[in-house]
Amino acid sequence: MIKGIAGVGGTALGVGGGVAAPPVSAAAVGSTLLAGKGVCLGLGLGLGAWGPVLLGVAGLACAASLCDYLKNRKAQAEASAEPA
């Protein structure tokens, strides 16, 4: 063991050694809301607070499009199943 490089309890600092970060601070590293950087997605797109809004609008548009597609597909299947 190298002098002066000791962790908690005398273990050498290396793989598995050292002090574990508390869960809240570990979560704050990955979360922009907990880190105090404001409301943003943190993707580096430069959208700021508009990022979550645009993502929500895009998600709603995709969901509406999917529902419309499934409804039309079901109507076409019922129309082709009816005898002419």
From Swiss-Prot:
It is found in: Magnetosome membrane. The chain crosses the membrane at residues 4-24, 41-61. It is a multi-pass membrane protein. Residues 1-3, 62-84 are cytoplasmic. Residues 25-40 are lumenal. One of its GO terms (cellular component) is magnetosome membrane. The keyword Membrane applies. Disruption phenotype: Deletion of any 2 genes encoded in this operon (mamC, mamD, mamF and mamG) decreases crystal size regardless of the protein combination. Deletion of the mamGFDC operon leads to smaller magnetite crystals in irregularly spaced chains, but no other phenotype. Deletion of approximately 80 kb of DNA, including this operon, leads to cells that are non-magnetic, lack internal membrane systems, grow poorly, have reduced mobility and take-up and accumulate iron poorly. Keywords: Biomineralization, Magnetosome, Membrane, Transmembrane, Transmembrane helix. Residues 41-48 are annotated as: LG repeat. Induction: Part of the probable 4 gene mamGFDC operon. This bacteria makes up to 60 cubo-octahedral magnetosomes of about 45 nm in diameter which contain membrane-bound crystals of magnetite (Fe(3)O(4)). Plays a role in regulating magnetite crystal size. Belongs to the magnetosome MamG (TC 9.B.95) protein family. This is Magnetosome protein MamG. It comes from Magnetospirillum gryphiswaldense (strain DSM 6361 / JCM 21280 / NBRC 15271 / MSR-1).
